[in-house]
């Protein structure tokens, strides 16, 4: 078993922390590691936006629960890192542990925090659409893709318009339609046609 996949493949279980939310570890892996803000920035954002609901004893949403768990895991990991730093005599070994935690576990926590904060902020469907859009963009050869990657904060505007379906019907028919309709062909509006 590869050591870098151990947290999600622990004890032979195929556990993907994003699966129940419609995403996968692979889908998030399209985003480069420097895309994700620092853990400190993400924790500050979560606290500023969702402190009350995160501290509440009420169940708000699965994203709140997952966010609580990620924050608690990071706290425990920092406690362990502090203990290792204070108790491991060999500086080279200490540096290896700290670097491993920051590089591997830090990235996984940053991904989890970003995903759940983004889902709470923008909506799960928008975040999933963004991940797919970015995945398509990054895999498209540079010569055939737009120069700039999709931006999550701009997706809700386009997503909302597209999700509403067709644009509302105009109240007045076009002149062409008005001329072509004869009195005997006009129908009274039925409840089904008003949807």
UniProtKB/Swiss-Prot annotation:
Residues 161-188 have a biased composition (Basic residues). One of its GO terms (molecular function) is structural molecule activity. Residues 189-195 are annotated as: RNA binding. One of its GO terms (biological process) is symbiont entry into host cell. The keyword Glycoprotein does not apply. Signal peptide: none annotated. Phosphorylated by host SRPK1, SRPK2, and maybe protein kinase C or GAPDH. Phosphorylation is critical for pregenomic RNA packaging. Protein kinase C phosphorylation is stimulated by HBx protein and may play a role in transport of the viral genome to the nucleus at the late step during the viral replication cycle. Gene3D superfamilies: Viral capsid, core domain supefamily, Hepatitis B virus. Belongs to the orthohepadnavirus core antigen family. HAMAP family: HBV_HBEAG. Self assembles to form an icosahedral capsid. Most capsids appear to be large particles with an icosahedral symmetry of T=4 and consist of 240 copies of capsid protein, though a fraction forms smaller T=3 particles consisting of 180 capsid proteins. Entering capsids are transported along microtubules to the nucleus. Phosphorylation of the capsid is thought to induce exposure of nuclear localization signal in the C-terminal portion of the capsid protein that allows binding to the nuclear pore complex via the importin (karyopherin-) alpha and beta. This is Capsid protein. It comes from Hepatitis B virus genotype G (isolate IG29227/2000) (HBV-G).
